[in-house]
From Swiss-Prot:
InterPro entries: UBQ-conjugat_E2_core, UBQ-conjugating_enzyme/RWD
Pfam families linked to this entry: UQ_con (PF00179)
Gene: ubc-25
UBC core domain location: 214-380
Molecular function GO terms recorded: ATP binding; ubiquitin conjugating enzyme activity
Tissue-wise expression: In the embryo, expressed in precursor neuron and muscle cells and in other cells such as hypodermal cells. After hatching of L1 larvae and in all subsequent stages, strongest expression in pharyngeal muscle and anal muscle cells. In L4 larvae and adolescent hermaphrodites, also expressed in the vulval muscles. Expression also detected in all four nerve cords and in neurons with weaker levels in all body wall muscles.
Keywords: ATP-binding, Cytoplasm, Nucleotide-binding, Nucleus, Transferase, Ubl conjugation pathway
Organism lineage: Eukaryota, Metazoa, Ecdysozoa, Nematoda, Chromadorea
Pathway(s) this gene product operates in, as recorded in its UniProt entry: Protein modification; protein ubiquitination
Family: Belongs to the ubiquitin-conjugating enzyme family.
Free-text disruption phenotype from the record: In males and hermaphrodites, late-onset paralysis of muscular functions required for locomotion and defecation. In addition, hermaphrodites show a progressive egg-laying defect, resulting in intrauterine hatching and premature death. Vulva protrusion is often observed with occasional rupture resulting in the projection of internal organs.
Protein name per Swiss-Prot or TrEMBL: Ubiquitin-conjugating enzyme E2 25
Active site positions, chain numbering: 315
Skewed-composition ranges (Acidic residues): 139-164
Length: 387
């Protein structure tokens, strides 16, 4: 478990160097799965950045994304960090990120930054993950800085420690590499993740890559989170891929809504008369996800009111680029849609002329018109008393 131990140590280094009261860069929360941090620019505005640690870290870098995609340098810097094959260590990546942002805003580098700088190229351990690899990046204690002499016994102890570290890495290679990231994920979820991973790998080999690395990894994380979710386990909603080879198109089935709503009564009638116990939605993601929102539309049944447009698109600022944030999870989006339907007094149409499903083309057209209208008039924000 040398890699995991090293990651925990590096996280502790970051939290110590950049606490929540640091004037330039702050670690807001940190775990072996995800780090959330804030960069404070010259205008004292906070820029939130998140790093998702992949299961095969440090052989693969973290997945980086930010809520502040309006600043071009952030997107470019995060893309470089996510796609790099060098300096995948979290300390080195944070060093690169802070350096890029300080240069962009013409700010002085934090005095703590050199302590997490990557080593000289010749010193980088090719194994990426041993305890030897990043020792030069750890902060130097004041007591150690004053010691200029190292005796032979100390050198022998260091050699023994290095040897132990190498042995630990061999042991770790025999373990399930997904164990840390897949805790709490159901067998069904693990099977889906395994199948999707194999398909993605084959698509790369065939040169038929879908989407982007960032979008694919974020969607895989969303699948894990969904299969851990109590809402999912309690049957509030279910989800599946429209096609098993396409990670970018999902079916979402909403099974439960507020029991005090007319929509709840309509869903009971739908199940009794038509043997359908859910509202079916299509979620389509593009290669810019999570920076761009998914395109969401109702597929069936036909719904009147509830902010559902004629083509099946949904009138929600959350689903537009202006209202979306890369920090939103897919589950939070699903639950917000359910609340919006109830708030808008959505009703299922049992009229025979509405038995056919909506179409993607009509939904896209109506949503485009919606965006143009709200771009001019803005969005209505209800008072807090209305929820």
């Amino acid at each position: 478990m040398a890699c995991l131990r090293k990651l925990k140590e590096d996280i502790q280094v970051l939290e110590k160097l950049f606490p929540k009261n640091h004037n330039r860069f702050q670690i807001l929360s940190a775990s072996v799965d995800e780090l959330s941090m804030k960069f404070i620019n010259a205008e004292n505005k906070g820029i939130i950045v998140t790093a998702n640690i992949q299961e095969n870290y440090p052989r693969q870098p973290p997945i980086w994304f930010s809520e502040s995609d309006d600043v071009p340098v952030i997107g470019m810097s995060l893309q470089r960090l996510t796609e790099t094959e060098e300096s995948t260590n979290i300390l080195h990546q944070v060093h690169r990120l802070v350096s890029d942002l300080c240069s962009f805003y013409n700010l002085q580098m934090p005095c703590e930054l050199p302590q997490i700088a990557p080593p000289v190229r010749d010193d980088i351990d090719e194994g990426r993950g041993s305890d030897i690899s990043d020792t030069t990046s750890e902060p130097i204690d004041d007591d150690m800085a004053g010691d200029g002499e190292v005796d032979d016994d100390d050198e022998e102890e260091e050699d023994d420690e290095d040897a132990d570290g190498d042995i630990e890495i061999v042991e770790m290679a025999e373990e399930d590499p997904t164990s840390q990231h897949d805790v709490g994920v159901s067998k069904e979820g693990l099977d889906m993740l395994d199948k999707v991973s194999k398909i993605n790998r084959q698509q790369h080999l065939d040169g038929k890559v879908q989407g982007s690395i960032t979008a694919t990894d974020r969607l895989m994380k969303e699948i894990r989170d969904i299969h851990r979710s109590e809402h999912f386990k309690n049957g509030i909603y279910t989800f599946e891929l429209e096609k098993e080879e396409n990670l970018y198109q999902w079916w979402i089935k909403l099974h439960k809504v507020d029991e005090d709503s007319p929509l709840f009564e309509d869903m009971k009638k739908l199940k009794k008369d038509h043997n359908q116990d859910h509202l079916l939605f299509s979620f389509t993601f593009n290669e810019k996800f999570p920076c761009d929102p998914p395109f969401v539309r109702v597929v069936a049944p036909h719904i009147n009111q509830g902010f559902v447009l004629g083509g099946g698109a949904i009138c929600m600022e959350l689903l537009t680029k202006q209202g979306w944030s890369s920090a939103y999870s897919i589950e939070s989006c699903i639950l917000q849609i359910a609340a919006t339907l109830v708030k808008g007094r959505a009703r299922i149409s049992f009229d025979a002329k509405h038995t056919s499903t909506y179409s993607m083309a009509r939904a896209q057209q109506s949503f485009k018109s919606l965006q143009q209208i709200h771009a001019k008039s803005g969005w209505y924000t209800p008072p807090k008393t209305e929820g």
